[in-house]
Swiss-Prot record:
Zn(2+) binds at H111, H148, H152, E211. It comes from Serratia proteamaculans (strain 568). It is found in: Cytoplasm. Pfam families: Peptidase_M90. Gene3D superfamilies: Collagenase (Catalytic Domain) (3.40.390.10), Glucose-regulated metallo-peptidase M90, N-terminal domain (1.10.472.150). The gene is mtfA. Interacts with Mlc. Keywords: Aminopeptidase, Cytoplasm, Hydrolase, Metal-binding, Metalloprotease, Protease, Zinc. This is Mlc titration factor A.
């Protein structure tokens, strides 16, 4: 049983039973009891500080709120909820949504038009999510929309725009930047060889450093074995930055499950 970790300022998901139910997803199963209790505390703080606004008739339940908060809390488990202080609202669509956007093609021409988005993280505004993809973020699959958008906010704390370099010690910036760009180039080489669909990781990581940081962070938390094998140096960078070791957690859980098999 997870003990209720505070006595006052109870978050919107009001009961311990609701938190325990919200925790029951594969992504969070490797966390030990101390980490789960800490995660609930951070998630509760996030629910106190942020408003989750359902759009297009979506009915928002307490379990949905709790699970969204837990996913936001995971990357800042050891950093603290204050690291996500750059926004006040989480806008939640039922499914991927259409926005007007501008983009530049390979020839430098700028185009504009409707684009389907899964999520957005505005520099001085809300995070936008969709519930369909949030639900797909519950597994240990390498995909996590909430972590992706939360990481953009962490990235923006280092100067106001997402560059792929979060607030880290000055002495570590050169190595981080070098290794992140090396990972992008390595992934692009793989994409050129086998195509986007057959690539070992989401091709979106090769588009720019900010997206590479966000996408690889998804793997760090939800497919740590793949990231540690594919880009071990980036795994170590992330482990130091987030102050977490998801691979060790997963291996511990796997060992416990193996020990239970007769």
């Amino acid at each position: 049983m997870i003990k209720w970790p505070w006595k006052t300022h109870q978050p919107q998901a009001e009961t311990l039973a609701q938190w325990q139910d919200a925790l029951a997803i594969p992504l969070l199963s490797p966390l030990d009891e101390r980490e789960q209790q800490r995660l609930i505390v951070v998630a509760g703080q996030i629910l106190q500080q942020k408003s989750i606004v359902p759009l297009q008739g979506l009915v928002l339940t307490s379990q949905m709120q709790a699970r969204i908060a837990l996913l936001f809390a995971l990357p800042v488990l050891e950093l603290g909820a204050e690291c996500l202080d750059g926004f006040n609202e989480i806008l939640l669509y039922p499914s991927p949504f259409v926005v007007e956007d501008e983009w530049q093609d390979d020839f430098g021409l700028v185009h504009s038009g409707p684009v389907v988005q899964s999520g957005q993280s505005w520099e001085q505004g809300p995070i936008v999510l969709n519930w369909q993809d949030v639900q797909d973020s519950f597994d240990l699959s390498g995909f996590n929309l909430v972590i992706h958008e939360a990481v953009h906010k962490l990235d923006m704390r280092n100067g106001g725009s997402a560059t792929g370099i979060p607030p880290i010690p000055l002495r570590d910036i050169a190595a981080w930047e070098h290794d992140l760009h090396a990972a992008m180039e390595n992934l692009q080489d793989e994409i050129d060889m086998v195509g986007e669909e057959a690539a070992s990781m989401d091709a979106y990581a090769a588009t720019d450093p900010a997206e590479c940081f966000a996408v690889l962070s998804e793997y760090f938390f939800s497919a740590p074995e793949l990231l540690a094998n594919r880009f071990p140096v980036m795994y170590q960078h992330f482990s130091r930055f987030y102050k977490q070791d998801p691979l060790a957690r997963l291996q511990r859980l796997q060992a416990e499950n193996s020990a239970e098999v007769p």
